[in-house]
């Protein structure tokens, strides 16, 4: 999918200078679990939203928020993105605002790095929220733009306790 990102053809948006930081090694998190079903694992990555753009979803976990604020790109979506030699600028749009971040495409586990923390903090993301990342532009030089929809989730306040923090104290859901 090649979308034109010529600045003269895009809607006017505030200019954001990306914060440049080195990409960390990608061995900090374990690889994602294997897909639950054999034929439907690509559904999220290939089902278009209203605009017909590819997207992926992420259920916000503790690892997305603490300590390094990194958003890992699902492997089933990575084939839609260019394979840059190193870090590439990416912009996240949500709620009429924009955040500059970096796409680390040269790592085995692709991720959004620098700038993701500002997005997560500014949008008050919590464990249990979900984000839908719609790829709205991909430049020839590798720049990416995502429109992000935030779906608030989480557990009701009456069930939030220390249970569920470890496998020794699971949260039990009874029908």
UniProtKB/Swiss-Prot annotation:
Q: Name one GO cellular component term.
A: nucleus
Domain of life of the organism in this record?
Eukaryota
Pfam families the UniProt entry points to: B3 (PF02362)
Q: Which InterPro entries does the entry link to?
A: B3_DNA-bd, DNA-bd_pseudobarrel_sf, REM16-like
- Where is this chain's protein located in or outside the cell? Nucleus
Q: Which UniProt keywords apply?
A: DNA-binding, Nucleus, Transcription, Transcription regulation
User: GO MF terms on file?
Assistant: DNA binding
What residue ranges does this record give for the DNA-binding region?
56-154
Region Disordered, annotated ranges: 1-45
Q: What is its main location?
A: nucleus
In Swiss-Prot or TrEMBL terms, this protein is called B3 domain-containing protein Os06g0112300
């Amino acid at each position: 999918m090649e979308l034109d990102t010529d600045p003269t053809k895009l809607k006017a948006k505030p200019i954001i200078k990306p914060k440049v930081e080195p990409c960390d090694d990608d061995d900090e998190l374990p690889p994602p679990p294997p897909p639950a079903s054999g034929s439907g694992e690509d559904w999220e990555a290939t089902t278009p939203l209203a605009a017909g753009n590819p997207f992926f979803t992420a259920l916000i976990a503790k690892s997305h928020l603490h300590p390094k604020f990194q958003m890992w790109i699902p492997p089933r979506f990575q084939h839609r993105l260019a394979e840059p030699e190193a870090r590439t600028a990416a912009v996240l749009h949500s709620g009429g605002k924009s955040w500059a971040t970096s796409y680390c495409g040269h790592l085995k586990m692709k991720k959004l790095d620098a700038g993701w923390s500002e997005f997560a903090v500014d949008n008050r993301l919590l464990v249990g929220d979900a984000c839908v990342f719609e790829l709205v532009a991909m430049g020839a030089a590798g720049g990416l733009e995502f429109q992000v929809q935030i779906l608030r989730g989480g557990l009701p306040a009456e069930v939030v306790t220390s249970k569920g923090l470890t496998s020794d104290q699971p949260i039990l859901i009874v029908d």
